[in-house]
Amino acid sequence: MSPTHLPSAEYYASLPKHIAGAGAVIHDAAGRILLVQPSYRTDTWEIPGGGLDTGEHPLQAVRREVKEELGIDLTPGRLLAVDWVAEQADGRPPLVNYLFDGGLITQAEARTRIHLDPEELTAWQLATPEQWDSLLAPHMARRVHACSRAMTQGLTVYLQHGFDLTGRQT
């Protein structure tokens, strides 16, 4: 029996679907990371970023999202982590999130350069590693801790829902 080959359009339509996002890990010299509070979710904080638009690649998305959310023109640094999040019980498709080094910012620079989009964000802060677990959702806290290690150690890590599966944890 010979294998059946689908026409390209049918084959591509049959492949699994996922969504993608990109985030910026913006930090200061003391290791604090810039966190933002979404206007639509006041119980937790996040890092700047968001979903990729159709036809957009992750670097374009992180630049656009940081510009929209913070008013900052960002030139992202290296890729720190890729985080795969499986399909959720609420029906959200699988997510692949690309996390980039967003560079250094001082408290003084942040005060003058950050202009929040009030429709998206209500506040920002430079948070210490000790604050991350209480401010961030558990998967986001794991993600930020992993990105901090990746920056310090010069690594890129692979995560699954924030868990580092590269075996390089310290």
Regions of interest found by a model, annotated:
Residues 52-75, 84-140:
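Unchanged
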Residues 17-19, 28, 92, 119:
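A generic fold-level signal
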Residues 16, 43-44, 83-88:
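Short, solvent-exposed loop/turn segments at secondary-structure junctions
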Residues 28-68, 163:
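Conserved Nudix-box catalytic region and its N-terminal flanking loop in Nudix hydrolases
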